[in-house]
Amino acid sequence: MLFTFTSSFIKFINSNLAFVLEYNKQMLEFDSPLSSVRGIGPRFIQKFKQLGINTVGELLCHFPVRYEDFSDVVKISEISPGEKCTVRGIVKKTSVRRAWRKRMFLVESEIEDDSGKIRAVWFNQTYIQNSMGVGKVVNLSGAPSAERKSGQLYFSNPSYEIVSGNAAARAKHTARIVPIYPETKGLTSRGIRYVIKPILESVKIPEEIIPEKIMSKHGLMGLAPSLRLIHFPNSISDAEKARRRFSFEELFILELRLLGERAKNVKNNAYKIDIDINLLKSLTAGLPFKLTMSQKKALWEISKDMSRSYPMNRLLQGDVGSGKTIVAALAGICAANGGFQTAFMAPTEILARQHYETLKKTFPNFDGGIALVTGSGAKIYYARELETHADKNTVKREIEKGGVKIVVGTHALIAKKRTGENGITFKKLALVIVDEQHRFGVKQRALLLGRGDTGGGKTSAERQIPHFLSMSATPIPRTLSLALWSNLDFSSITEMPKNRKPIDTRVVEPRERPAAYAFIRNEIARGRQAFVVCPRIEPATNDEQLTTKELYELIVKSVKEEYEKLSKKIFPGLFVAMLHGRMKAEEKEKIMRDFSLNKTNILVTTSVIEVGVDVPNATIMFIEGAERFGLAQLYQFRGRVGRGEHKSYCFLFSDSASKDIEKRLLSVAKAKNGLELAESDLKIRGPGEFLGDEQTGMPDLAMKALKNPALVEEALEAAKEIINEYESLSNYPELKKRVEKFGEKVHME
């Protein structure tokens, strides 16, 4: 159906183009609906909607993803095989025939200029015969191919355009730098160009929102020429300048939004938590290990923030196993000592229980009360191993009365169910700690921050906003930290505890798999345990319809398949368990508990193991389909082993023969810290690797611009200049509207 939609669209436009151009001399506004543009019918309005385009402005901001350079116009006798060019000639003949042995139709045309003739062939595009009428002057653009036997040159599926009369000056698809757009079924780049070209000539360009001094200082092109040249550039250089302007604009708006949030946060009230230095010294002295210098520095930065009268907003970043949790826990104990409460939210029940157990074990004499609240239950721990299992309502009442100072939990801390069960309300919540903050939405975090000072009929200006500390093991490249989290302060733990041994990491070839299995068997015989990570849960359902090569490229072994293989064929005498996100919480808890107690030898799992799981006796990380993961994620997987006294190993398996993939995996084996891998990931895979699977709402252009450190720094500098001068943006009303609108759509998670 694709060519049917396209053909009807093109035929309609071809026959009505002059009318469309004449009609559109009446000025269109940027916010005019597409339905107001004559020549675009309901069917194509719907196609544009599928691309998120509803207005003229949204269409003009639907930027090309790349360009085809057909600007080299040559004689037919001058063309060379494989080299992109445009030829102009007269159609001498056109025919349609069914291809031999193939279920398709061929349209063939012969075009002639004063230097020679050339044949053009289109496959399954029979509508083209209506355009390629004998005697018409046309442009053909593409890279010519040579016939196998005769060596004669011809065009295969070239771009074409009728250029008789005045049309030659308005070429859109040939003889120029041609834009290629994001498309949808039934709406091609050719169709999009047909619509954009006349609109560009008739639209009223809005007022420039970037201040003149910023435009001048950063050498930015104006809005009107930028719109024209990003769609129909005279050169690739023109296109790059226009793209730079729009990329800068998106980053500039983002930074204004984030810096505005930062300025607003400073005006909020928070509980001042005076840190008892003697208590802190006593707590750290009682730890079974010494804090690293990085941990001490991070703890000092956090303590300093908490002692202020406005809310802390800090990200604590460090490699897996670097000791972030103990730093956050010490901050929570210090808050409790001042009579305040701390909420500690984790993304999974497994991790929440782990944090709860760590707090109990590390601070056994803490008598302020440590509660665990998850979807499957609740309990409270007081000093000297006095632990009470209670129903959630009882635990909630204790928290609301202030009888529990540290509350660890999952989404259950903020849950509001159909039964009427609400999340927890705290009496004096002063500190919120969120582990792996990018796994929670902005609204979820806001709900937790709102669990504090809610009573007494206080206005928002009178309320006390909790200090906010987020933790992440995801290494964040400097470019992203500048661009996406300029509203946060950063603390980085750059050292690993001295008792951590280096992990021997190897990229394993398929022929070495039996030896790797034997190695695992030997390690388990010595009392150790192993993780096996697979990217997918379910196997493909239509394997029989795929070739071996397609299976080889597309199917990563599922957890269930791997579990069956390992438990029945490879390690039949060992205890193998399986863990994935579709299991019930109670089942996952039992599996992890058994693995932690060494009742299970091998745990086959999905990427859930990436987040926080701590089993010191596990010494082998076995990653299937390693090429399917980002470098930083592989580094985090590796950090799940090497936490005990025994030497640990990480095996990276890939069935791919690609040298590039092998090179990427070897970089993980050689890496000494996650940050250098994160920088590589940003260049190779883009910012989506760090922002997670959930859409941020950020424009594609801004996402791509995040790979340009220099442009990010320029935009941040410009935003700071404007915010410092006019914090409320009152002098720039249109810019202020744009920033507010941007904030409604974009969320950094």
Model-derived features with residue positions:
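Conserved helix-turn-beta segment of the N-terminal RecA-like "Helicase ATP-binding" lobe
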Residues: A352-L386
